[in-house]
A protein has these predicted regions:
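Extended, highly charged
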Residues: 1-279, 284-294, 298-617
Length: 617
């Protein structure tokens, strides 16, 4: 069903039993976020908050809380969207299948944005920032934030929608040093289109005009986070997914979405920053306070009976998890088509997305040789780390399509449950085991030091700075993985647990990376090749890590800075290449420079428990 507004979507969800109305007045300070999290964790419906303390406007969240609900919302337009993306990725297919192409033409007409000729913000009233639902999500947050903002900017050299960018960059509405109703904070990370626009404006010494849209058809929200093929703008995509052309106009030189519920316009002046944050973010930790651009508010608009759309982020999975699932469902092979030889890629949500990337490539360089070792997948890995958002990956595990012969399988894999063909990257535990069976730790580890990394990742040396590790393995199985603790590990006199075959967590209470490295010196090859121990994790709580595979994934890959926190048993450097003969040792302890993990406010939790009882949660 095509929706012209956020309210139309919510009413349709209600008709189909997918909406919960909270009729009591709720506090935007922590309480609304806690309600959202409780209902999300229960796989509950979308939520409409009818009375928000301190604001006359309603608010909605958990709209995209499950993949099933997201697919329901776009049930009538998803096929056409996927078809158009396929045509954009592979124009030859359009020639080969002309009937399919013709059927996509009506949807393509919705891709053309529609400018309102009156040049007025139709049906809007002018309000202040203080009139909005000022929702603070977590106790240590610096203030209230917009968490589903559609931030629109244009290229100052080529103004107009044709060279615009629409992205989702959080907005801080109050707190810190911001002057209420006059200033808001604009936080954006590396590899974002808005950065290109601000750089150009700065070079000319001119302010960058910014428009922030909130609400409107749900298709607009999805468009802001889509990795789109070259030449397809977010507004094109929004129109096709909504089955309604993206409506806009200009007010005082600022672009205004005529379908949005709220619009905030303002300017970012060169060199004008203010402290932004902290904010409890999607890695499960607070992103700390740092200088980011301050936006001078020009005007704030709201439609009559507008609905404030928001989400709550934290340690995965959260509502943004289903965003990722929906994106994968829509785009399919878009990314792998962009990188020659790449077959599959998966940013692991449980690790916070950017910290852990899994990929399957191809090995076609030397098919005439029996020697099987990484070659083409190293080229593919470099391409991945030079491509858009994929370049923010901290750990990249990459292998190639299976090549093991039946004879090899019979020799190497008898009595072993590990897959002999490469599992899908979406089967994370199986994929890691497949690689750990094949990895040559003296050859297959490639560190990238002193490089950029995700703004939200505090495992590195400084903001936006750290290291990366490419683990590239290809070939036959080299070893079986340990499923019980070897004597060499139990003799360390430290609490130890098997996390998964080949991976062991050891308590940091009595041991460190270096103490273990010293105690196991000279025993590395036996421990790795005969005992099957591939990775030793040092952590404060190995029992907790062993409880749940996702605990291991989250704690390890968010807390480890590869160049600083990884050592190996019997390690060395040859021709500037680091490797080891024994297991890798990861220091996954919490360090002093790490950002704190988010914790719940128990008083608020009690109130939420009482409130939600009557709603069955």
């Amino acid at each position: 069903m095509a929706y012209s507004s956020m309210e139309a979507c919510l009413l349709d969800l209600e008709r189909n039993g997918m909406l919960l109305r909270i009729k009591e007045e709720v506090d935007p300070y922590l309480e609304m976020a806690a309600i959202h999290l409780r209902i999300f964790e229960s796989k509950g419906p979308a939520i409409l908050f009818e009375k928000v303390k301190g604001s006359k406007y309603r608010a909605a969240s958990n709209i995209f809380g499950t993949l099933e609900r997201s697919e329901f919302i776009f049930r009538d337009t998803l096929p056409a969207v996927k078809q158009l993306i396929d045509i954009k990725i592979n124009p030859l297919a359009a020639i080969q299948h002309p009937l399919k192409t013709l059927s996509a033409l009506p949807a393509a007409l919705h891709a053309i944005p529609c400018k309102n000729p009156i040049n007025q913000p139709v049906l809007f009233e002018e309000i202040n920032i203080s009139d909005l639902p000022l929702i603070q999500h977590h106790p240590m947050d610096g203030g209230a934030f917009v968490t589903l903002p559609l931030v629109y900017t244009e290229d100052i050299d080529k103004p107009g929608m044709g060279n615009s960018n629409l992205g989702m960059y959080r907005i801080q509405l109050n707190g810190n040093d911001y002057i209420l109703n006059k200033e808001v904070g604009l936080h954006y990370q590396l590899h974002r289109g808005i950065g290109v626009h601000q750089t150009k404006a700065n070079h000319k010494g001119l302010p960058l005009k910014v428009s922030c849209f909130i609400g409107g058809p749900p298709a607009h929200t999805v468009a802001a986070v889509m990795p789109l093929p070259e030449g397809m703008s977010e507004m094109n995509f929004a129109g096709v997914l909504a089955a309604k052309r993206f409506g806009y106009t200009y007010v005082d030189g600022f672009c205004v979405s005529t379908d949005a519920d709220f619009v905030i316009t303002g300017e970012v002046f060169p060199g004008e920053n203010k402290p932004e944050g902290p904010f409890g973010d999607h890695l499960g930790y607070y992103s700390l306070q740092h200088p980011f651009p301050v936006m001078k508010v020009h005007k704030v608009f709201a439609k009559k009976n507008a609905i404030w759309a928001f989400t709550v982020v934290g340690r995965p999975p959260q509502e943004d998890t289903s965003f990722g699932q929906l994106i994968h469902h829509i785009t399919g092979a878009a990314v792998s088509n962009e990188i020659p030889g790449l077959k599959e890629v998966h940013a692991v949500d449980a690790a916070g997305v950017h910290p852990l990337l899994l990929a399957i490539g191809s090995e076609r360089y030397t098919p005439y040789l029996d020697n099987k070792k990484p070659a083409e997948i190293l080229t593919i890995a470099n391409h991945i780390l030079g491509t858009g958002q994929l370049s923010l990956a901290k750990f990249l595990w990459i292998t190639a399509e299976s090549i093991t012969s039946q004879k090899d399988n019979a020799t190497l894999v008898s009595n072993n449950s590990v897959a002999t063909t490469v599992p899908s990257v979406h089967k994370v535990d199986e994929f890691l085991q497949y690689m750990l069976c094949r990895m040559d730790f003296s050859n297959d580890l490639h560190f990238h030091t002193k490089t950029t990394m995700d703004t939200l990742d505090y495992s590195g040396d400084d903001l936006n700075s750290g290291s990366k590790l490419v683990l590239a393995a290809y070939g036959n199985q080299r070893r079986k993985l340990a499923t019980i603790l070897p004597e060499k590990i139990t003799s360390l006199n430290a609490q130890a647990h098997i996390i998964m075959p080949g991976v062991i967590a050891i308590s940091a209470e009595k041991e460190t990376v270096y103490s273990i490295q010293e105690k196991l010196k000279g025993q590395g090859e036996d421990l790795l090749e005969k005992q099957g121990v591939t990775i030793i994790i040092i952590t404060e709580n190995p029992a907790w890590m062993a409880e749940d595979f996702n605990n291991f994934i989250w704690a390890t890959f968010t807390r480890v800075n590869p160049a600083n926190d990884i050592e190996g048993v019997d390690s060395g450097i040859e021709n500037k290449h680091w490797g080891c003969k024994g297991p890798l040792i990861f220091d996954a302890t919490i360090k002093k420079h790490h950002a704190p993990a988010m914790e719940k406010n128990m008083e608020v939790e009690k109130r939420v428990t009482s409130l939600l009882k009557k709603y069955g949660f």
